[in-house]
């Protein structure tokens, strides 16, 4: 999460250098998954804040307490920097109850979703013209070429496929052997 904060802070500085007209979204909704309960949600929060938007975060129900602790730290940092902590709000409500209302709300300009492709399609059906940044279900491949070190390739494939119990969005699910 700290790496995300540093990355997006530096990215925000570069917006000034670009000499382009930049109009931030007013409100960004962050809807993260359960499997990385701090890093992924905070990445979305920091990206939206760095771009000048207010943030609503609706964490996965399995990890609300993690999100609450992280958001308290964000509020403390914002206050220390002289920024209103109210720019970041956490919603703790049933997904079925809150999801459609939040996504389709007239003041929400954009949604950052890390989750299933079906969820992205559902969000799009609720608000077709919104900006949806969706990192969704994927099949990730590792390509092993003839010049690869075989022992290192096996170790990396094993780590990618089975590290984090296969619950990482970038976990390898396909190995392509070339040559």
List where the protein language model places each region:
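Generic hydrophobic/aromatic pocket-lining and core-packing "Φ" positions
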Residues: 45-46, 99, 120
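ALDH superfamily catalytic-core signature
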Residues: 73-82, 106, 116-179
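Residue-level signal for inorganic ion chemistry
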Residues: 52, 88, 111, 138, ...
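Conserved small-residue-rich beta-alpha loop and adjacent elements
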Residues: 14-81, 130, 151
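General beta-strand structural signal in soluble alpha/beta enzymes
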Residues: 57, 90-92, 113-115, 132-135
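A structured beta-alpha segment of the ubiquitous adenosine-cofactor-binding alpha/beta core
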Residues: 18, 89-112
